[in-house]
Amino acid sequence: MAVLKPLCPLLLLSIICFGLIRSEANGPKVTDKVFFDIEVDGKPLARIIIGLFGKTVPKTVENFKQLSIGTQLKDGRTASYKGSTFHRVIKSFMIQGGDFTNHDGTGGFSIYGDRFPDENFKLRHVGAGWLSMANAGPDTNGSQFFITTVKTSWLDGKHVVFGKVVEGMNIVRQIESETTDSRDRPVKSIKIASCGHIPVEIPFSVTNSDAVE
C-alpha cells in the first residue's frame, strides 16, 4: 500500500493562500471599466476608475457606459457625464452625480428614454465604494447614480447596484469631505471634467467588501 507523503510547508502555504484569495474575490465580475477625471472649482484633482458588472446587470451597465463615453440618442439629444457635477454629498453615506441637464438632482435621462425599469436587485450595498442607481422610486432609473462611502444595507432591494470603485477611492473620500450647504450641495463645484470607457479583456471578480483607498 502506498503511503502518502506529507505536503512540504511551502506548497501547503501556497494552497492556503490561493484558497484565501479565491474566497475573498468571490463578488461579481467586472466586465468593463469607466474613468472619471475630477475637477474641484476648475482645478484638477485626480481620476476615479469604476468596475462595472456587465454580466449581472447588463442593461444598467450599458446605460452607464454609454453615458460615460458620450452618445447621441435617436431623438437627437446628446447624453454625457462629461461636464456634469456631483450635486449631492453626504458624509458617511454617499456622493451623488449624473444629472447632466440640470446639475441639481432634478434632471438627466437614460439611453433608453427618460426612465427605465429596475433591472434586478441581485447585488447589495455591502460597503464603501459601490456604485448604484439613484431613483425617485421603483422603475425610475435615468442617469443619476451614487457611490457609497459606508455600507448602506437599507437601500438593498430599492436601488440597483452595478459597479464598484477599483481605483481612486481616496478621491471619493475627498469629495465626501467637501463642505456642503443645508441641502447637501457642495459649496465648491465638483465636476467630471473628462470621462470614458476602459475595455476589460479578461473579466475579474471583486471582493464583497469596502473598496480599497
UniProtKB/Swiss-Prot annotation:
It catalyses: [protein]-peptidylproline (omega=180) = [protein]-peptidylproline (omega=0). Residues 1-23 form the signal peptide. Residues 35-197 form the PPIase cyclophilin-type domain. One of its GO terms (molecular function) is cyclosporin A binding. It is found in: Endoplasmic reticulum lumen. Inhibited by cyclosporin A (CsA). Its main location: endoplasmic reticulum. The keyword Secreted does not apply. Keywords: Endoplasmic reticulum, Isomerase, Rotamase, Signal. Its EC number is 5.2.1.8. A motif (Prevents secretion from ER) lies at residues 210-213. GO terms for biological process: protein folding. PPIases accelerate the folding of proteins. It catalyzes the cis-trans isomerization of proline imidic peptide bonds in oligopeptides. PANTHER family: PEPTIDYL-PROLYL CIS-TRANS ISOMERASE, PEPTIDYL-PROLYL CIS-TRANS ISOMERASE D-RELATED. Belongs to the cyclophilin-type PPIase family. PPIase B subfamily. This is Peptidyl-prolyl cis-trans isomerase B. It comes from Schistosoma mansoni (Blood fluke). The gene is CYP.
